[in-house]
Amino acid sequence: ETAAAAGDTAGVGQIWVDDAVPNTLMFTNDVGTDIQLASTLEVTAAKVTQGTKVASTSGTAINFTGVPAGTKRVTLSMQGVSTDGTSNHRILIGDSGGLETSGYLGAQALVSSGGYSSSTGNISDGMRITITQAADTSNGTVVLNLIDASTNTWGMLVISGQTTNQLTLSASSKSLSAALDRITYTTVNGSDVFDAGMISIQYEI
């Protein structure tokens, strides 16, 4: 904070905080004219909470419940996540009424090092990660961003590299009936068993 801008310099403007009126942001142009930009300036950093890391080494689903109220972004990070089968991995979200298995608006693309690529549109049953063989492991990130709190609408993005030299990109959106409070990482067939890896979760409020 200061009482005034520093000495005028031709062609140079200055941004400063006025100490006579605390938290008032000022701009002084190159001819010395003071312009108030904002008063009661406050900067609030997002609160990031690191959830518990979960081993994806058993069961048919990895469940994360108790998403904090007011959460605006959720990040899942996967390392070496594998199952004993070849069903595509699937991410589902839900609220107090349970998980949602339909109504997603999404698409998916697969790119491999051999030059093969494919895409699938109108995916309505969740976010998918392509699996082509049981040896595939998923490594990457799932990001969920709150689009509209009034309709509990979320935008979702998946980037996952598989150890069989392929990359999955998936994007979707989904509206819930109530606030998001649960996320599940599972498979499309729901019966393949997880046998390796781990998943962590972060919340931003």
Where are the predicted features?
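Residues in flexible loops and secondary-structure boundaries
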Residues: 5-7, 23-25, 33-35, 61-62, ...
